[in-house]
Curated annotation (Swiss-Prot):
Protein name (record): Threonine--tRNA ligase
Subunit note: Homodimer.
Protein keywords: Aminoacyl-tRNA synthetase, ATP-binding, Cytoplasm, Ligase, Metal-binding, Nucleotide-binding, Protein biosynthesis, RNA-binding, tRNA-binding, Zinc
Known EC number: 6.1.1.3
PROSITE patterns per UniProt: AA_TRNA_LIGASE_II, TGS
Keyword Cell division: no
Gene Ontology terms for molecular function: ATP binding; metal ion binding; threonine-tRNA ligase activity; tRNA binding
Region of interest (Catalytic), ranges: 243-534
Keyword tRNA-binding (UniProt): yes
Function description: Catalyzes the attachment of threonine to tRNA(Thr) in a two-step reaction: L-threonine is first activated by ATP to form Thr-AMP and then transferred to the acceptor end of tRNA(Thr). Also edits incorrectly charged L-seryl-tRNA(Thr).
GO process annotations (BP): threonyl-tRNA aminoacylation
Cofactor binding note from Swiss-Prot or TrEMBL: Binds 1 zinc ion per subunit.
Domain TGS, chain residue ranges per copy: 1-61
Length: 642
C-alpha cells in the first residue's frame, strides 16, 4: 500500500501499486487530463510507470519546464512516425531534445527539399490530431534488437550493440505502427504534441564523426500552446532580421571566405567598431590599474607541455615546425603572461600585479561549428591575469566582478546570470587546491551579494571559474565574461615571489575576460542594436549632405570641423536628390544626418535629423558639435532628443 507524498506535503494512501496518472486522477479529472509525467523521488518517470513503494511525487504538466521538454522529445518520435509513413526506406538514427525544440537524424538517400518538409509537417499534424495513445513497453535487450532488426533499423541496432548493456531492459515507445527506443519519459498521448513547427534541414555526421555517413538532420520547435509557439516564431523572425552576418554585409563591416575559414576580414567600418571597442576596454584597464602587455603569437611545444595545455588541449591548437622545433599558435594568453611575470625578481610588495592583453588567439574549431563572428578560429581575447597572494584573492575577484558589471552596463546589458563552474573530471592540481579555489570564488560572489548557480564539473582543467551570461533584447543567453582562479599554472611554469618572511612562494593567478572574444562580442552587439550602434561606437557618427553643388564647400567645412572635434564625420556630395541621400544613409544606420542648403550655409547652421527620422531642427555647427561630443564622451545609448 504505497503512500504518496505530494509537493504540498499532503499524503495519499493507495491499496495497490499506482501510476502517476492514477494519482493525478485521484486528485481530480483536470489534473489527470493535464498529466504528462511524474517526478518520483526526484527521478522523471512516465505517467504509466508503476509506483509500488512509499514515494514523493510531483506531477508534471505542460505548465512545467520539464513537461515542455518531454513533449518536445515526443515530437521527435512523432516526426519519426510521420517520416516512416512517407519514406518507409529511411533509417532512423537519434532524435534528442535541444533548446526550444528537437531534431532527428535520418539516413535517406533522397535529399530532402522544402516541399518534403512541408509534407512532413502536414503528416505530423494529421497524426497528432488523432490524439493516439503512446504505448510504452519495457523489453529485454534481445527483444529490442530483434524488433529493430525486423524493421531494418541499423542505427538503433548499433546503439544497442555499442551503448546498451545486454542486461538492460530498454523501453520501446509504440506510436501506432512506429516503434522508437528511448530512456523517456514521453507524453502518454499525442494530444500534448499539437503546437510544433519544422524549421530546417542540415547535414550531420553519424555520431559527429566525419569518417561516418552524412545524415539529414531535421530541426523542429515545439511548445505547450499556440501562443508560446507564435511568440517563439516571432522572436526567430526578429532574430533573422538582426542576424549579424546579414547586417555585417549590408553595412560593409566584414567578410569571411573559404580560403580562411573562421578568420575575419575586417572592412573599414567594421575595423572602426573593433578599435572603438578595444579603446573602451583599454580605458577600463586604466581605471582598474592594469598593465597592458603583448605576447608572441606562437611558442615552442615544450612550454605548452609544461603548462599542461598540450596534454589537455593539443587537438584544439594549430602547430607548425621550423628548424626541427615544433611550435603551437597560442589558443590562449595565460602561459605567455606567466613568462612576462617571471622576468625579474618579484616581491610581495609587487602584488597584486594585473596584466592585460588584447591577445590574438587561434583555436582549431571544427569547420561545421563555425558561425560568422560568433564561432571563429582566429579571435582577439580581452584577456587579463592577476597575480596575487592568497589573502588578496577575494578582493581581486571582487574587483574583476565589478569591472564586468561596469562594462556590460555601458552596452545596456542588465540581465546577467552568474554561474560558478567547479572541478571537471580531467584536471590538474590536487583536491585541496580545488577546495580552496572554489571556496574563494564562492565567498567573492557572496560578499558582492550576487546570486549564482553552481555548474558541477564545468570548470576549466586548471581551475574553477565564474561565468557571466548576459541576456539580449530577444532574451537569448550569451556567455561572455569569466573570472577564474588558478592555483596550478603559476607553479607549473615556475612563477614565484619573495614573501614577507623572505621565502619563495607561488602566486595565485586569476584569469579574467570580460567580452571573451572581441569578434564574438561585436557579433552580439550587431544583433542587439540591429546595426543601430550607439553614437560613441558607430563607425560613422555623422553624415553631411548638400542639397545642391552650391553648398559643397560648406559641407566640406562642416565635416572638417567635426573631425577636428574627434567626431567621425563623412560627406555625401553626390548629385542626387536629398531624399535619396537621406534614405540611403538611414539604411546605413548613421546616427545623425545633417542637411545643408543655402539658408544653413548663410547662417552657419546644419539641419539635424536622426536615423530614426526625428527632426531636431537647425543648430549652429559648434552647438551641435558640443552636444554630440558630450553624448559621445558619456557613451550614451540614446540619440539626442528634440
Amino acid at each position: 500500500m504505497p503512500v504518496i507524498t505530494l509537493p504540498d506535503g499532503s499524503k495519499r494512501e493507495f491499496a495497490q501499486p499506482v501510476s502517476t496518472l492514477d494519482v493525478a486522477a485521484d486528485i481530480g479529472p483536470g489534473l489527470a487530463k493535464a498529466c504528462i509525467a511524474g517526478r518520483v523521488n526526484g527521478e522523471l518517470k512516465d505517467a504509466c510507470d508503476i509506483i509500488d513503494t512509499d514515494s514523493e511525487l510531483s506531477i508534471i504538466t505542460a505548465k512545467d519546464e520539464e513537461g515542455v521538454e518531454i513533449l518536445r522529445h515526443s515530437c521527435a518520435h512523432l516526426l519519426g512516425h510521420a517520416f516512416k509513413q512517407l519514406w518507409p526506406e529511411a533509417k532512423m538514427a537519434i532524435g534528442p531534445v535541444i533548446d526550444n525544440g528537437f531534431y532527428y537524424d535520418i539516413d535517406l538517400d533522397h535529399k530532402l527539399t522544402q516541399e518534403d518538409i512541408d509534407a512532413l509537417q502536414k503528416r505530423m499534424t494529421q497524426l497528432a490530431k488523432t490524439n493516439y495513445a503512446v504505448d510504452k513497453r519495457v523489453v529485454s535487450w534481445q527483444e529490442a534488437r530483434d524488433t529493430f532488426e525486423a524493421r531494418g533499423e541499423s542505427y538503433k541496432i548499433e546503439i544497442l550493440d555499442e551503448n546498451i548493456s545486454k542486461d538492460a531492459t530498454p523501453a520501446l515507445y509504440h506510436h501506432e505502427e512506429y516503434v522508437d527506443m528511448c530512456r523517456g519519459p514521453h507524453v502518454p498521448n499525442m494530444k500534448f504534441c499539437q503546437n510544433f513547427k519544422l524549421m530546417s534541414v542540415a547535414g550531420a555526421y553519424w555520431r559527429g564523426n566525419s569518417d561516418n555517413k552524412m545524415l539529414q538532420r531535421i530541426y523542429g520547435t515545439a511548445w505547450a500552446d499556440k501562443k508560446a509557439l507564435k511568440v517563439h516564431l516571432n522572436r526567430l523572425e526578429e532574430a533573422a532580421k538582426r542576424d549579424h552576418r546579414k547586417i555585417g554585409k549590408q553595412l560593409d563591416l566584414y567578410h569571411m571566405q573559404e580560403e580562411a575559414p573562421g578568420m575575419v576580414f575586417w572592412h573599414n567600418d567594421g575595423w572602426s567598431l573593433f578599435l572603438e571597442l578595444e579603446k573602451f576596454i583599454r580605458q577600463k584597464l586604466g581605471q582598474y590599474t592594469y598593465q597592458e602587455v603583448k605576447g608572441p603569437l606562437m611558442m615552442d611545444r615544450v612550454l605548452w607541455e609544461r603548462s599542461g595545455h598540450w596534454d589537455k588541449y593539443a587537438d584544439g591548437m594549430f602547430t607548425t615546425n621550423s628548424e626541427s622545433r615544433e611550435y603551437a599558435i597560442k589558443p590562449m594568453n595565460c602561459p605567455g603572461h606567466v613568462q612576462i611575470f617571471n622576468q625579474g625578481l618579484k616581491s610581495y610588495r609587487d602584488l597584486p600585479l594585473r596584466m592585460a592583453e588584447f591577445g590574438c588567439c587561434h583555436r582549431n574549431e571544427p569547420s561545421g561549428s563555425l558561425h560568422g563572428l560568433m564561432r571563429v578560429r582566429g579571435f582577439t581575447q580581452d584577456d587579463a591575469h592577476v597575480f596575487c597572494t592568497e589573502e588578496q584573492v577575494q578582493q581581486e575577484v571582487s574587483a574583476c566582478i565589478q569591472m564586468v558589471y561596469d562594462t556590460y552596463e555601458t552596452f545596456g546589458f542588465k540581465n546577467i546570470v552568474v554561474k560558478l563552474s567547479t572541478r571537471p573530471e580531467k584536471r590538474i592540481g590536487d583536491d585541496d587546491m580545488w577546495d580552496r579555489a572554489e571556496e574563494a570564488l564562492k565567498q567573492a560572489l557572496k560578499s558582492n551579494d550576487i546570486e549564482f548557480e553552481i555548474l558541477p564539473g564545468e570548470g576549466a582543467f586548471y581551475g574553477p571559474k565564474i561565468e557571466f551570461t548576459l541576456h539580449d533584447c530577444l532574451d537569448r543567453a550569451w556567455q561572455c565574461g569569466t573570472v577564474q582562479l588558478d592555483y596550478a599554472l603559476p607553479g607549473r611554469l615556475g612563477a614565484t615571489y619573495v614573501a614577507e618572511d623572505n621565502s619563495r612562494q607561488t602566486p595565485v593567478m586569476i584569469h579574467r575576460a570580460i567580452l571573451g572574444s572581441l569578434e564574438r562580442f561585436l557579433g552580439i552587439l550587431i544583433e542587439e542594436y540591429a546595426g543601430k550602434f550607439p553614437t560613441w561606437l558607430a563607425p560613422q557618427q555623422v553624415v553631411v549632405m548638400n542639397i545642391t553643388d552650391k553648398q559643397s564647400d560648406y559641407a566640406e567645412e562642416v565635416v572638417n570641423l567635426f573631425k577636428e572635434h574627434g567626431i567621425r564625420a563623412t560627406k555625401d556630395l553626390r548629385n542626387e536628390k536629398i531624399g535619396f541621400k537621406i534614405r540611403e544613409h538611414t539604411l546605413r544606420r548613421v546616427p545623425y544626418l545633417l542637411v545643408v542648403g543655402d539658408q544653413e550655409m548663410e547662417n552657419k547652421e546644419v539641419a539635424v535629423r536622426t536615423r530614426e527620422g526625428v527632426d531636431l531642427g537647425k543648430m549652429q555647427i559648434q552647438e551641435f558639435a558640443t552636444k554630440l561630443k558630450n553624448q559621445i564622451s558619456l557613451r550614451s545609448l540614446n540619440l539626442l532628443e528634440d
